[in-house]
Amino acid sequence: MILVDTNIWSELTKRQSDPRVLAWLAKHEPDLRLSVIVIAEIRTGYELPRARQIRPMLELWLDGLIAAYSDRTEAFDTRDAQIYGQLAAQRTEGSNTLDLQLAAQAIARNIPIATRNVRDFAWTGVKLIDPWAV
């Protein structure tokens, strides 16, 4: 299993997605997991005023992603919350709540996170995969 960060999923919405990321996603598709934390982050992004023009397209895309991964969506549970609390107490400058919650999910399940933002997660000790660097 691999938890996929928002920046990886968002690559799919670009006009010219990075071929390395697309190849990585295709290769690992059966192992990919969608986090409810990522769903919240994507939803937040397209609710912002600057996304008004593309909101309908992003809503359809997110609905499709949720449907495609309905049996591979990771909820945020009490174990995740406990680990999040530990991480939040040690928070480094620049760490945001959603990243820490995603890291907590990965740590609780002992699985890696696929992300481009390796530096944001490295201090948590979570296993990381950067599809841009593979």
Each model region followed by its residue ranges:
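Short acidic-hydrophobic, aromatic-tinged amphipathic segments that line or gate anion-handling sites
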Residues: E74-A75, I129-P131
